[in-house]
Amino acid sequence: MFKYKQVIVARKDLKLSKGKFAVQVAHGAVTAAIKAQKEKPEWFKAWFHEGQKKVVVKAENLEELFKLKAEAEKLGLPTALIKDAGLTEIPPGTVTVLAIGPGPEEVVDKVTGHLKLL
């Protein structure tokens, strides 16, 4: 049973290719994990040794990402908001995903438990 997880929240309103989408999710997962390793080393270590559970869900738009980020940070969860470089499909600086955690599953679920899987 997993006790820790990371959730990556993608914007539903962006029309990204599968490849672009996968890269943005990966950027979020790695960036938030590195942040957690520095800020919450005990959470990172437990998550890493449990198998690094990750879940990808969807949010309606940018405003919802900002709201989720604020909620997560209020609970002390590490977050990473990913902005695209804009070299291929979307304008530079477009926020694509929000990664939350890794953190205790019950805390992460307070922020993301209502979101639908992608």
From Swiss-Prot:
GO terms for cellular component: cytosol. It is found in: Cytoplasm. Keywords: Cytoplasm, Hydrolase. GO terms for molecular function: peptidyl-tRNA hydrolase activity. Its main location: cytoplasm. It comes from the Archaea. CDD domains: PTH2 (cd02430). It is an enzyme of class 3 (hydrolase). Belongs to the PTH2 family. The natural substrate for this enzyme may be peptidyl-tRNAs which drop off the ribosome during protein synthesis. This is Peptidyl-tRNA hydrolase. It comes from Thermococcus kodakarensis (strain ATCC BAA-918 / JCM 12380 / KOD1). The lineage of its organism: Archaea, Methanobacteriati, Methanobacteriota, Thermococci, Thermococcales.
